[in-house]
């Protein structure tokens, strides 16, 4: 299972191609499947990664009553889209399909709340959950991450953080601070410079943070 943003088509391409190399089909939500159609129309996604081309399939989440009743629980666009997929010979799958053939699919979800879908899929103990997004940068994101981790423990899954953005991760920043042991720190290109107060404590170093430096403060 991979958690990644619904609009990050570059990352999706990487995920889907990795799945293909391992003889797996990528399963995405109806909403993401519809987004993939848009990306293809804009020339940003190859046709081979559209639902129906054999490498990607749409799955139908449980909604409302908890059963899969398209007429009762699903929006009109969802019903229409499912019908379009069926007309093209690309019938969507359901959680029971993913559960029965777990070695055949890579399931992609797009938000922390989507982890609840896994309760119906019932992943095999030890299954891998990949956080393919940046690490939490604020309290709300920290809470979301912890909530997902709690569910993963209940489901018997193990999590892995896989993200390449050119930015150092939290653990990497702590290690850099520990190794460099600076006397002064000037956060640059940071939306949350105050977070460095926490990082310094975790690194166990004594350091003065200068958020809006004056020339006199830059003298060592």
For the regions a language model picked out, list residue spans one by one.
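Acidic/His-rich, metal-assisted hydrolase cores and their charged scaffolds
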Residues: 1-220
